[in-house]
Amino acid sequence: MADVTLSRTGQVSRKTNETAVSVSVNIDGTGVSKIATGVGFFDHMLDQLARHSLIDMEIKTEGDLHVDDHHTVEDTGIAIGQAIAKALGDRRGITRYASLDLAMDETMTRAAVDVSGRPFLVWNVTFSSPKIGTFDTELVREFFQALAQHAGITLHVQNIYGANNHHVAETCFKSVARVLRTATEIDPRQAGRVPSTKGTLA
């Protein structure tokens, strides 16, 4: 039987009239990241995503920031999702499901994921301010929508409570990171099988 843990890496380069994005990921990494999107707060969040998922990420985005951050954030999410999907391949042997409540000071956020091959986002997060510094808070959802769609995952994110918008955003990234870490891990009891009675995840 083939080693399902062999080379779980993915690389994507994506260029449009609005952005140029290059992403490489290693699902079986240690959370090392090299990130440059031109958007400081977003870089900080992506660093959290890599660190707590233990997925190594190298991300370089050049976007039309003279317009706003939207295209940069969304297209980076698309490319990360595509790279993760490539790295997972047919998803053979993975744990598949995970959920977690994550605390950060006064904030609690819940994330649940099914690495199913079927993209869907349920988003129950509200920010009390339209911006964190200069970053539009609505872009947090846009990022996760792009990630879920292109990684082929069903993702639920719910902020249970929290007063600080930075903490709310950060717990979204950290909780999603932790469930991705668990759900994409190889389960030795699966013995290399696809974790579905259908025999495929699509």
Swiss-Prot record:
InterPro entries in UniProt: IGPD_sf (IPR038494), ImidazoleglycerolP_deHydtase (IPR000807), ImidazoleglycerP_deHydtase_CS (IPR020565), Ribosomal_Su5_D2-typ_SF (IPR020568)
Reactions the enzyme catalyzes: D-erythro-1-(imidazol-4-yl)glycerol 3-phosphate = 3-(imidazol-4-yl)-2-oxopropyl phosphate + H2O
Protein name (Swiss-Prot/TrEMBL): Imidazoleglycerol-phosphate dehydratase
Localization of this protein: Cytoplasm
PROSITE patterns: IGP_DEHYDRATASE_1, IGP_DEHYDRATASE_2
PANTHER family named among the record's database cross-references: IMIDAZOLEGLYCEROL-PHOSPHATE DEHYDRATASE, IMIDAZOLEGLYCEROL-PHOSPHATE DEHYDRATASE HIS7
Record flagged with keyword Amino-acid biosynthesis: yes
GO cellular component: cytoplasm
Involved pathway(s): Amino-acid biosynthesis; L-histidine biosynthesis; L-histidine from 5-phospho-alpha-D-ribose 1-diphosphate: step 6/9
NCBIfam families in UniProt: PRK00951.1-5 (NF002109), PRK00951.2-1 (NF002111), PRK00951.2-4 (NF002114)
Gene that produces this protein: hisB
Family statement: Belongs to the imidazoleglycerol-phosphate dehydratase family.
CDD domains membership: IGPD (cd07914)
Keywords, in A-Z order: Amino-acid biosynthesis, Cytoplasm, Histidine biosynthesis, Lyase
GO biological processes: L-histidine biosynthetic process
Molecular function per GO: imidazoleglycerol-phosphate dehydratase activity
Chief site of localization: cytoplasm
Enzyme Commission identifier(s): 4.2.1.19
Organism encoding this protein: Sinorhizobium fredii (strain NBRC 101917 / NGR234)
Entry's transmembrane regions: none
